[in-house]
């Protein structure tokens, strides 16, 4: 009986992890001034996943999707570097789950522009979030 209870508990956890929450998406777009021909260097990662370094030309987009973990502690950070010399940069928290029962399925959109970094969630209007260092 004890083994059956443990087995059912483990199967239940596996089922929850498969259906729990929806996939969220992080998108980063290079909207820098085309006259300057700046390439945007992007490096996103979490505690457990390194998405890798991407180089985005003007107008290009990178995106990736993920599920928030069961504990609601999922967090992704992105470092954005403004070309051509990549001396101007900014680190952002691109996504942060809030709470034990965090489940989302939203799209987190980051836009790199000459005057700073802009953000919008899903189809809401974008707004100025932070400046380049």
Curated annotation (Swiss-Prot):
- GO cellular component labels: extracellular region
Q: What is the lineage of its organism?
A: Eukaryota, Viridiplantae, Streptophyta, Embryophyta, Tracheophyta
The superkingdom listed in its UniProt entry is Eukaryota
Q: Which InterPro entries does the record match to this protein?
A: Self-incomp_S1
The similarity annotation says:
Belongs to the plant self-incompatibility (S1) protein family.
Could you list this entry's UniProt keywords, alphabetically sorted. Secreted, Self-incompatibility, Signal
**Pfam families recorded:** Self-incomp_S1
State the compartments where it is located: Secreted
Q: Which residues form the signal peptide?
A: 1-21
Q: What is this protein called?
A: S-protein homolog 21
Query: One biological-process term from Gene Ontology?
Result: rejection of self pollen
């Amino acid at each position: 009986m004890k083994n059956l209870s443990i087995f059912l508990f483990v199967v239940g956890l596996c089922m929850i992890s498969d259906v729990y929450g929806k996939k969220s998406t992080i998108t980063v777009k290079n909207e820098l001034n085309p006259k300057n021909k700046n390439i945007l260097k992007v490096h996103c990662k979490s505690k457990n996943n390194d998405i890798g370094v991407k180089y985005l030309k003007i107008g290009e987009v990178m995106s990736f999707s993920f599920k928030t973990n069961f504990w609601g502690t999922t967090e992704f950070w992105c470092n954005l570097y403004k070309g051509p010399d990549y001396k101007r940069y900014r680190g952002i928290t691109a996504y942060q789950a809030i709470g034990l029962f965090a489940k989302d399925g939203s799209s987190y959109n980051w836009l790199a522009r000459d005057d700073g970094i802009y953000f919008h969630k899903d189809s809401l209007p974008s707004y100025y979030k932070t400046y380049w260092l």
